[in-house]
Amino acid sequence: MASRSMRLLLLLSCLAKTGVLGDIIMRPSCAPGWFYHKSNCYGYFRKLRNWSDAELECQSYGNGAHLASILSLKEASTIAEYISGYQRSQPIWIGLHDPQKRQQWQWIDGAMYLYRSWSGKSMGGNKHCAEMSSNNNFLTWSSNECNKRQHFLCKYRP
């Protein structure tokens, strides 16, 4: 019995030193159907909503959820890989918008707008809401008319 307890203690000690235990114990859980990456939970919804309704639906999930801000290439790549497991052709609303309609883009969740991934046909006209474009496997963004109905991505920090 003492030997079994000692082995368990040794195993837990090894896991703690490698960081594996921290991932197992400290990792918060996301809502069912959402996925976890780097301290955030993401929900991909294949419902058709305009940008404003998509944002309202994200907020309805609580936990401070909004349409997703994408702040790095690593985050963009993880999201793109996840979405590609469901579909490869429909654009997806994200939380980037131009509320004053002056090409002054900002994230709806208040995150700093530093990382940019606009496609060549990114902005112009009456297009003041951003989408992840299915061209280039969801790694680039395009602007679109905010009243267009399409899939959307929500994000919150658990």
From Swiss-Prot:
Any one of the GO BP annotations: response to bacterium
Signal peptide: 1-22
Gene name as annotated: REG4
Organism annotation: Homo sapiens
Glycan attachment sites: N50
Lineage of producing organism: Eukaryota, Metazoa, Chordata, Craniata, Vertebrata
GO cellular component, one term: extracellular region
GO molecular function terms attached to this record: heparin binding; mannan binding; signaling receptor activity
Protein's job: Calcium-independent lectin displaying mannose-binding specificity and able to maintain carbohydrate recognition activity in an acidic environment. May be involved in inflammatory and metaplastic responses of the gastrointestinal epithelium.
Origin superkingdom: Eukaryota
Keyword field contains Glycoprotein: yes
Record keywords, A-Z: Disulfide bond, Glycoprotein, Lectin, Secreted, Signal
Subcellular location: Secreted
SUPFAM superfamilies hit by this protein: C-type lectin-like
Pfam families xrefs: Lectin_C
Induction: Up-regulated by mucosal injury from active Crohn's disease or ulcerative colitis. Up-regulated in colorectal tumors. Up-regulated in epithelial cells at regenerating margins of peptic ulcers in the stomach and duodenum.
InterPro entries, A to Z: C-type_lectin-like, C-type_lectin-like/link_sf, C-type_lectin/snaclec_domain, C-type_lectin_CS, CTDL_fold
Protein known as: Regenerating islet-derived protein 4
C-type lectin domain sequence ranges: 37-155
